[in-house]
Amino acid sequence: MLPAVSAHLVIRLGGKPMRLFAGDADEVGEFISHSVIGGVRDAAYLKDSSDFAPTVGVVFRPGAAGAFLGVPTDSFAGSHTPLDAFWGQAEVENLRSELAEAPALERRIEILEHALLRRLPRIRGVDPAIVQAALLLERRPVGKVATALDWSHRHLIARFSEAVGLSPKRYARLVRFGRVLLRLERQPETGLAEIAQDAGYADQAHFNRDFRSFSGISPGEYRKAGGTGCHVPEQNRPENSRR
């Protein structure tokens, strides 16, 4: 699995708990839970996708996950944490049972949405300044974003990192990486040099280096493996290892 700028909630309604691997040499892995919060990550991770089960989940907007969980987003960044660590075991098991008994996907989405909305009276909303910063960082350098918000560079880094779980610079790089992934998937005939130039990389080497730092593979290898979004099939990726 490749990194992205958003935290996510996943609830498996059957099968085994989510299993992650420490690396290619790890043949056992670690079972996390059926209900998991995936924090914002800036590196790829290895997940077992062989045990298919019905699943429902949420991808949070930047900064929103921490609001719904009642803790700073940076406190669970870079990790996968059982949902009951935030909501309590009884509440999570009741929610999972209700989701499993629902007759259709649309109903499951409604149930999960209502579960999140019920928490709104107990949480603080996402700081509008953080929302604005996230939008500005998609197109502007960090220094100009700080100026636009009338914040110091240091204050922007501290506030944004706590709310989103990534530094502003790292967030901006991951946003660009996400745009590149989308284009690689949707425009298979477009050359890598053109994609690199349009994304604002200095040259092809810069593009390859940045892409590999997040994914562990080159853009060409990703395209050859048939990657879709943040997913690279195990059997198709280089060295045939899990990702």
Question: Which stretches of residues belong to each language-model region?
Answer:
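Alpha-helical bundle regulatory/interaction domains
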Residues: 1-153, 163-168, 182-187, 191-202, ...
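DNA major-groove recognition helix of helix-turn-helix
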Residues: 160, 172, 210-212, 223
